[in-house]
Amino acid sequence: MQTYGNPDVTYDYWAGNASVTNRSGRFIASHAAHTGMIAFGAGSNTLFELSRFDSSLPMGDQGFVFLPHLASVGIGFDEAGVWTGAGVVTLAILHLILSMVYGAGGLLHAIYFPDDMQKSNVPQARKFKLEWDNPDNQTFILGHHLILFGLACAWFVEWARIHGIYDPAIGAVRQVNYNLDLSMIWERQVNFLNIDSLEDVMGGHAFLAFAEITGGCFHAIAGSTKWEDKRLGEYDRLKGAGLLSAEAILSFSLAGIGWMAIVAAFWCSQNTTVYPIEFYGEPLNRAFVIAPAFVDSIDYSNGIAPLGHSGRCYTANFHYIAGFFAFQGHLWHALRAMGYNFKDLRAKLNPSAA
């Protein structure tokens, strides 16, 4: 992270991952523990919503967030095609168990395993050391992330093809084969809000799976080949010398997360194919309250939905707000990565204090 020339900088507890910047073992520990927290939140909130679910009322009127996600991918339906929550308890408890596994993994990496992967006795583990200004090291780690993302996309495509997902056009779960039309996929980059075909949705995921796995394999091996060094030369400005740092990579990550969150917010607020009305409620209107926000297009103040809002409203606004702050974090860390010291700004605004 940016130290402004201070070699003895220390970080307080609230500094988050800054304290593990150069300790890859502890970096993994924090991520494993964070994954455990996410799994626990998913499992516990699913059980909470299931305990409040009233089968005599439309799910979309009850202000749920977790149950609609499960229902939209075809989980919880009985053989007659009625959503009863079948299997949801098992899935929620599985998440709770996995949260303990991830938490234990975080503790192992924090207490037992080396704090830096370079100290590991396992040669394969040492490859995942953190050298923030080394593009070969960073591209190796990036490649493995892309492969895992691609496998997740491929798994979702196969789930829709074999098990089936919910199609609001027919009001039932059906098997969906992907439509790998590249012209359609290209067009949907800017016209995704109106997508009304599950085949097109799965086609996009299939394309992403191919692109991410292919790109991941390239990144995982390209940084260590003699061919690349021969064609591009050793580590220089063309390969990012002087550009990469922990702060810069954090800013890149926050920009990507922020963009995805904003896209998800608009998509959830308007699209009724991926986010069916039966589960999420009616599409939202855009409004300016204290800040730009999404508001329900119909009245949900019937005492059923929490705080009188639909699950669509909660989901869209949470993603929008999270995306906004992720962008602010991106700008903050990008400026710091470029060497800007925010203490200078304080001095300029209040010269007498300086």
UniProtKB/Swiss-Prot annotation:
A GO molecular function held by the record: chlorophyll binding
Gene Ontology annotations for the cellular component aspect, listed alphabetically: photosystem I; photosystem II; plasma membrane-derived thylakoid membrane
Keywords linked to the UniProt accession: Chlorophyll, Chromophore, Membrane, Photosynthesis, Photosystem I, Photosystem II, Thylakoid, Transmembrane, Transmembrane helix
Induction notes from the record: This transcript is too unstable to be able to determine its expression levels. The whole antenna complex is most highly expressed under low light; as the light levels increase antenna complex levels decrease. Thus at least in this strain the amount of antenna complex is controlled mostly at a post-transcriptional level. Transcription decreases upon iron starvation.
Keyword ATP-binding (UniProt): no
One example of a Gene Ontology biological process annotation: photosynthetic electron transport chain
UniProt cross-references to Pfam families, sorted A to Z: PSII (PF00421)
The keyword Transmembrane helix appears for this protein: yes
Location relative to the cell: Cellular thylakoid membrane
Topology of the protein relative to the lipid bilayer: Multi-pass membrane protein
Annotated transmembrane regions: 27-47, 88-108, 140-160, 201-221, 248-268, 315-335
Cofactor: divinyl chlorophyll a; divinyl chlorophyll b
Function: The antenna complex functions as a light receptor, it captures and delivers excitation energy to photosystems II and I. The Prochlorales pcb genes are not related to higher plant LHCs.
Family: Belongs to the PsbB/PsbC family. IsiA/Pcb subfamily.
Record note on quaternary structure: The antenna complex consists of divinyl chlorophylls (a and b) and divinyl chlorophyll a/b binding proteins and binds more divinyl chlorophyll b than does the antenna complex from high-light-adapted Prochlorococcus.
Note: This low-light-adapted strain contains 8 pcb genes.
Protein name in the entry: Divinyl chlorophyll a/b light-harvesting protein PcbF
Organism of provenance: Prochlorococcus marinus (strain SARG / CCMP1375 / SS120)
Taxonomic placement: Bacteria, Bacillati, Cyanobacteriota, Cyanophyceae, Synechococcales
Gene from which this protein is expressed: pcbF
